[in-house]
Regions:
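Loop/turn elements at helix/coil->beta-strand transitions in domains of secreted/extracellular proteins
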Residues: 54-58, 85-88, 122-127, 181-187, ...
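Aromatic-lined carbohydrate-recognition surfaces of secreted/lumenal glycan-active proteins
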Residues: 62-63, 189-191, 221-249, 288-298, ...
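Sec-dependent N-terminal signal peptides of Gram-positive bacterial secreted proteins and lipoproteins
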Residues: 5-22
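Glycoside hydrolase catalytic-domain groove-lining segments
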Residues: 248-300, 338-339, 343-356
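Substrate-binding cleft of extracellular glycoside hydrolase catalytic domains
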Residues: 99-230, 234
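Substrate-binding cleft of secreted/luminal carbohydrate-active enzymes
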Residues: 54, 58-64, 291-362
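Alpha-helical scaffolding within the catalytic cores
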Residues: 43, 70-79, 110-114, 172-174, ...
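N-terminal module-boundary/linker segments of secreted carbohydrate-active enzymes
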Residues: 22-107, 308-309, 350-362
Length: 362
């Protein structure tokens, strides 16, 4: 009896050892574009695994400005002067939607590409957003509300409105193509803050749900996705969906899991521990980011160290943040050094280990 019991224990031990010795199967998170470039696939998978780390798990980010208007490397320089470190992500906006121009596509400028290419080659990741001019007008008017009937005309490529949209998209795609040709993956964030009432592509009234409007927005988002992906064959984009934290209907506009790689919140706040929407967005089962952040009252008194502490305590699935520039910047507020030097924060130069991304933690 004793011998049988001993043999049984030995068998159980050997079985347990075999299970423990079996390597953990790697879980790969791929971009929604099945034809994505290998580097883009690698970056997407690496980003998605960041929450598994115990440190170096939240990419720092900064907005560099609007191309050919305010964009420069000055924001990165200010942050480096304040902290000794540089943001891992650097953002540019291709669209100056407020400009009154002869042709609406003239509001699109991609001259920040040279700096973004250099940033990538020196260990950073570019992000591109679009404050698109309003195709219901000849140019400008990015904050002028439109009716749903006007929205439908914008979606129709045979109308003057639709042709204006297409002209802008063509020029944007040309700029993105230049980045792809250089092997540069891009965090691409079109049509942001759609649940707010300030941009033409979003709602028209404060927290008033409009199901037709929501449907039109989804059609517009998908139109842009299919144009960039299928028509233009751009395979280096990581698609980012980013509603506003201070408005309702954060997930109502979600175009679907097949069109979004990363979900996030644009959040301007005074209390970093009271940002709305984290649970709603993470329930979509996509990597989560604070896609645009800054203090609600921009007077230099905001403490960014509280923000990274809040991420650690309340929003631990966060993979990156992108702070706005000018008076919202960490460089002109408090706690910039604590934010960038926190053990959770990952900065430019810490993404790559030689020619390979730093190790993934399963």
């Amino acid at each position: 009896m004793f011998k049988k019991h001993t043999i049984s224990l030995l068998i159980l031990f050997l079985l347990a050892s075999a299970v423990l010795a079996k390597p953990i199967e790697a879980h790969t998170v791929s971009p929604v574009n099945p034809n994505a470039q290998q580097t883009t696939k690698a970056v997407m998978n690496w980003l998605a695994h960041l929450p598994n780390r115990t440190e170096n798990r939240v990419l720092s980010g900064a907005f560099g400005g609007y191309s050919h208007d305010t964009f420069s490397m000055a924001e990165a320089d200010r942050i480096r002067s304040a902290t000794g470190l540089s943001p891992a992500i650097y953002g540019c906006d291709y669209a100056r939607g407020w400009l009154e121009t002869a042709n609406i596509e003239d509001s699109i400028d991609v001259s920040c590409n040279g700096d973004l290419i250099s940033y990538w080659k020196n260990g950073g990741i570019p992000q591109i957003s679009l404050h698109l001019a309003n195709p219901a007008f000849q140019s400008g008017h990015f904050k002028t509300p439109i009716t749903n009937d006007q929205y439908k005309k914008i979606l129709d490529s045979s109308t003057a409105e639709g042709k204006r949209l297409n002209a802008m998209l063509s020029k944007i795609a040309d700029g993105l193509q230049e980045l792809e040709n250089q092997g540069v993956p891009v965090l691409f964030r079109p049509l942001h803050e759609m649940n707010g009432e300030w941009f033409w592509w979003g709602l028209t009234s404060y927290n008033q749900k409009d199901n037709e409007r929501i449907s039109l927005y989804k059609q517009l988002y998908k139109k842009i996705y299919h144009y960039m992906t299928d028509t233009r064959g751009l395979d280096h984009l990581i698609w980012v969906y980013s509603p506003d934290a201070n408005r309702d209907f954060k997930t109502d506009f979600y175009p679907g899991a097949s069109y979004v790689d990363i979900v996030g919140l644009d959040a301007y706040f005074q209390d970093a521990y009271s940002i709305n929407g984290y649970d709603q967005l993470t329930a979509l089962n996509k990597p989560f980011a604070f896609t645009e952040v800054g203090p609600q009252t921009a007077n230099g008194s905001f403490d960014y160290s509280l923000f990274i502490n809040a991420i650690k305590q309340k929003y631990p699935k966060t993979i990156y943040f992108l702070a706005w520039n000018d008076e919202w910047s960490p460089a002109v507020n408090k706690g910039a050094s604590a934010l960038y030097h926190d053990s959770w924060t990952l900065n430019k130069g810490e993404i790559w280990n030689g020619d390979s991304l730093t190790p993934i933690v399963e």
